[in-house]
């Protein structure tokens, strides 16, 4: 069926303001788990950490912090509150993100230099084709809104721009996908989703749609990251792309009669 509606994630799918966030989150978790006195090596801990981070990517950040707290507890440690872990993580990634946003606001760099290559052309083409667009992110709503405005892409998302309202919100990408189907905006097979995490794949596959995995090797986003590719395929991705420069070829598959 011809696509009538598309979901886009933000970080690593559209914007690169927080490129490198996973390295920072892994480092934070390694430090917390080492402090428990565990005999596990970094090489043994890293896959455990990366697994829960990827599984929860696209969902509210607090869930990854709750998973960290549980892993500390399992090793006999006394974890910080998940909200404190989140505060520490946001402080670390915020230093990088704030500098990139400053470059945008002051005109030092064009918005495209902090976006996945080809993003704007895809958004323009999908709107031209009459596809309704939603941007849905696990990042806090206020931050998402500021960034999409800075990129000058808010206008493309006629379905709306959504971030996580609060840590205790029940809002989810899967829930929104089910809602648009229930409202008659599109049938499940008429929905496509672009994302670099498990949540985007799960949400669209749950309603029978098509999932496009952004296995971008950040920050250049010129080639496929094998680690992301493997996990996105396992999560249900129908297509894997490193960026949107292959859009014309992908479009032939998505819009084939």
Question: Where are the regions a protein language model picked out?
Answer:
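A metal-dependent, Asp-based hydrolase signature
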Residues: 51-113, 117-128, 132
